[in-house]
Amino acid sequence: AFVEKVYIPDLLAVASFYKDWAAIGAGVGNYMSYGEFQNDNVSNTTNCWLPAGYIKNKDLSKVLPVDQKKVTEDVAHAWYKYSGGDDKALHPYDGETNPNYTGPKPPYEFLDTNKKYTWVKGIRYDGLSTEVGPLSRMLIAYASGHKRIKEVVGMVLQKLGVGPAALFSTLGRTAARGIETLVTAEMLPVWIAELDATIKGGDLRIHNNEKWDPSTWPKEAKGYGFHEAPRGALGHWVVIKDGKVANYQCVVPGGWNSSPRDAKGQRGPFEAALIDTPIKDPNKPLEILRTIHSFDPCMACAIHVVDSDWSEIIKVRVV
């Protein structure tokens, strides 16, 4: 009720005063979703309530299938080093995470973007900088013919008096989060009823344990798992040898969206979305925050720091 009676009306009311932002903050124009809320087997991402897919160059007439083999990580502008050279991107199965800070000594005010300037790797799909998150999910569902999402997107566009092109913007990104919240909330009673019926039917399984026992594993194995976190596409890749983890890489939503430039000079979604943003007061660049906030950024999610001895790394005290 809150989403329908408060969130969406407030979203539309505020957005109506910022319709110029329907032409600002577009970003890279490439969008991906791994799919979420599977309709049958949890491993079947081709049959999801929120469909999987890839939209290239804002082309809503064609939704491409997602192929995990096309995901790579680039460190040309990130503070890491690859054993085979920093100019070649690696697939997560072959991924390396070797910290190599070459930036200025803190504290500093500026970073040279022609060099390495971030701890975030340059994540790419088929060599392309790609946005993930609510906007990507809603665009792919809309372009895939999802009935309810097409209805709600159409309603929002009509009430704001803008066309589908407005979706590729800061305003569109913000609206997509509200649209997704509404349609997902509408489905909750359905899913809860399904869960209730399943439990009453005696099915209490919470996971697939067919390959849970390490003794059943081959000498060498590889696997990956996809999930749509609220912020976007989340992927885990693992390589197992002799029953032990030989390599593991986690490619997270914050990494996709906050990616730096790659070896080819392609900007990541954050950077690309800020191009041509009008700034009223350079001393108070609220417009920059407006676009970055539309991605719901989380740098603590993009980069994880873990001590191998499980010692405390840093303590932050908020007073």
How would you name each of these model-derived features?
Residues 1-231, 242, 247, 252-319:
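Active-site bordering "gate/hinge" segments
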Residues 234-239:
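C-terminal, well-structured subdomains that either form a transmembrane helix-short loop-helix hairpin
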